């Protein structure tokens, strides 16, 4: 039996990079995956990741949602619970950067 069989994980910002790797590792351990992507240019990568995760024998669904928008996040979580029934794991991986230089960013 896999460690996370039957669990449901949310991974924000998972269309590529570290987020995609986290989603795949969780799926390999049996977790169903709900993940976000933010831009239209990431939609194809998100759909490819869904297919790759489903090959591991678990459910996956990609949601277009901006982690910087509270209402969008609230809607995302409500949609995940409606679709999967629960949330057991949350990995907040999405990066939010205005100009790539932390010292110049304002709260």
Name each region found by the language model.
Residues 43, 63-76, 107:
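The beta1-alpha1 cofactor-binding region of Rossmann-like NAD(H)/NADP(H)-dependent oxidoreductases
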Residues 8, 13-17:
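Conserved glycine-rich cofactor-binding loop
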Residues 56-59, 79-92, 98:
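A glycine-rich helix->loop->beta "capping" turn
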Residues 26:
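Aromatic pocket-lining residues of Rossmann-like dinucleotide-binding sites
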Residues 101-102, 106:
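Substrate-binding pocket helix/loop in short-chain dehydrogenase/reductase
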Residues 17, 39, 97-100:
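Active-site beta-alpha loop architecture of Rossmann-like, nucleotide-cofactor-dependent enzymes
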Residues 31-47:
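Conserved glycine-rich Rossmann-like NAD(P)H-binding loop of the short-chain dehydrogenase/reductase
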């Amino acid at each position: 039996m896999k460690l996370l069989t039957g669990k449901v994980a949310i991974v924000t910002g998972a269309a590529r990079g570290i987020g995609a790797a986290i989603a795949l590792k969780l799926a390999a351990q049996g977790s169903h995956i709900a993940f976000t992507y933010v831009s239209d240019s990431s939609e194809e990568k998100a759909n490819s990741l869904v297919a790759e995760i489903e090959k591991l024998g678990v459910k996956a669904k990609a949601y277009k949602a901006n982690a910087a928008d509270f209402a969008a996040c609230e809607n995302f979580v409500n949609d995940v619970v409606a679709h999967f029934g629960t949330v057991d794991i949350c990995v907040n991986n999405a990066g939010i950067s205005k100009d790539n230089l932390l010292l110049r960013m304002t709260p």
